[in-house]
Amino acid sequence: MYDIKKWRHIFKLDPAKHISDDDLDAICMSQTDAIMIGGTDDVTEDNVIHLMSRVRRYPLPLVLEISNIESVMPGFDFYFVPTVLNSTDVVFHNGTLLEALKTYGHSIDFEEVIFEGYVVCNADSKMAKHTKANTDLTTEDLEAYAQMVNHMYRLPVMYIEYSGIYGDVSKVQAVSEHLTETQLFYGGGISSEQQATEMAAIADTIIVGDIIYKDIKKALKTVKIKESSK
């Protein structure tokens, strides 16, 4: 079993987006710690299994971040289940999890399931609109969410998601200072080695996604953060 606590860098691939064989090879051979498959729109059983089969040729951990029950399938090393803490809709707190347990509870290996305390911070993102997230958050709000995740829910991962824009470094830093047990994931808008380095100095793990489809060379440079220690 892989130890996610050691992961510093993850590439996130969207099954609804096209990626060439050459670019996929570069991503999977880049020394990233893991590949995560997940997205918001048009995530289907067919496109998830197609992307999974392409990535499975490479010897690195493969994660499915669950966005709907229909696209869940065996074959992944881990299944990340988001609970969107700042959603105003209970479905995105535990509704998807409830349906997953009703459908697959008898066969789930809970050692493979990682629960993520998600906080969505970009009001203009598809993720925020889809999950009906309240993104008008102060630093104090984020600190309270961090305490909730770390001390009360005791979730293994807290994911600060800016989805499409680069986040407020001071707010991410404030969250980090309240997490003593929970692993901090940061994702959103990382499009350069400099941004990757800046966020990797705060978060335990950075997630790099959109830039893969815009500039593969810039995406690959973000892996250089692994050369330095946090």
UniProtKB/Swiss-Prot annotation:
EC number: 2.5.1.n9
Protein name, entry field: Heptaprenylglyceryl phosphate synthase
GO biological process terms on file: glycerophospholipid biosynthetic process
Gene name as annotated: pcrB
Binding locations of sn-glycerol 1-phosphate: K12, Y159, I160, E161, Y162, S163, G164, G189, G209, D210
Top-level taxon of the source organism: Bacteria
InterPro entries, alphabetized: GGGP/HepGP_synthase_I, GGGP/HepGP_synthase_sf, GGGP_HepGP_synthase
Family designation: Belongs to the GGGP/HepGP synthase family. Group I subfamily.
GO MF, any single term: magnesium ion binding
Record's catalysed reaction(s): sn-glycerol 1-phosphate + all-trans-heptaprenyl diphosphate = 3-heptaprenyl-sn-glycero-1-phosphate + diphosphate
Cysteine-cysteine disulfides: none
Function: Prenyltransferase that catalyzes in vivo the transfer of the heptaprenyl moiety of heptaprenyl pyrophosphate (HepPP; 35 carbon atoms) to the C3 hydroxyl of sn-glycerol-1-phosphate (G1P), producing heptaprenylglyceryl phosphate (HepGP). This reaction is an ether-bond-formation step in the biosynthesis of archaea-type G1P-based membrane lipids found in Bacillales.
Subunit structure: Homodimer.
